[in-house]
């Protein structure tokens, strides 16, 4: 199977997993990126069976609306049963690196609210140790140099992602060359740097379920 076919398979598996648990009052949290887009397209075939969605980015909101799915502001939603999103990397404990699409802060907020975080990814994203994929850090623009110096002290090699402004008006530093053996601790350390909005480690709140697309079919991993 191609990578696109694997993404479509895990997206459909996520729809199949949540659909029996949705009703006309249900609101679904939706992530950002190519795999999340596959999920949106698959979910749209059932748009009459649930109320609407909360989007983790402007791009996701536009795609949902394009399918005729109502999009709600998170502040107006009291209950979010599911959040479905892709990942750039996952370890066996379902700690994730996310943020390749620069939507990490809003993704982390929606994931924090949801009762169940379902990650959908192809098999190439499952790794023994996080860090081969550069770790994105969202930074207040005036703090870029300060944050970069602090990230070097933590053992990383930060690179400014040129030409990228987040939906929140901030910039991204991608931290290379980190072997992340304690993701919970590192997530906290980076977030404690003044000027950091958040970083792409999802370890304090990891995924609850990982639907992994493989050549043999979709495998389900749980934290």
Swiss-Prot record:
PANTHER family: RIBOSE-5-PHOSPHATE ISOMERASE (PTHR11934:SF0). It is an enzyme of class 5 (isomerase). The lineage of its organism: Bacteria, Pseudomonadati, Pseudomonadota, Gammaproteobacteria, Pseudomonadales. Homodimer. Gene3D superfamilies: 3.30.70.260, 3.40.50.1360. This is Ribose-5-phosphate isomerase A. The keyword Isomerase applies. It comes from Pseudomonas fluorescens (strain ATCC BAA-477 / NRRL B-23932 / Pf-5). One of its GO terms (cellular component) is cytosol. GO terms for biological process: D-ribose metabolic process; pentose-phosphate shunt, non-oxidative branch. The keyword Isomerase applies. Catalyzes the reversible conversion of ribose-5-phosphate to ribulose 5-phosphate. Pathway: Carbohydrate degradation; pentose phosphate pathway; D-ribose 5-phosphate from D-ribulose 5-phosphate (non-oxidative stage): step 1/1. InterPro entries: NagB/RpiA_transferase-like, Ribose5P_isomerase_typA_subgr, Ribose5P_isomerase_type_A. Its EC number is 5.3.1.6. Substrate binds at residues 32-35, 85-88, 98-101, 125. It catalyses: aldehydo-D-ribose 5-phosphate = D-ribulose 5-phosphate. Coiled coil: none annotated. Keywords: Isomerase. It comes from the Bacteria. The active site is at residue 107. One of its GO terms (molecular function) is ribose-5-phosphate isomerase activity. Belongs to the ribose 5-phosphate isomerase family.
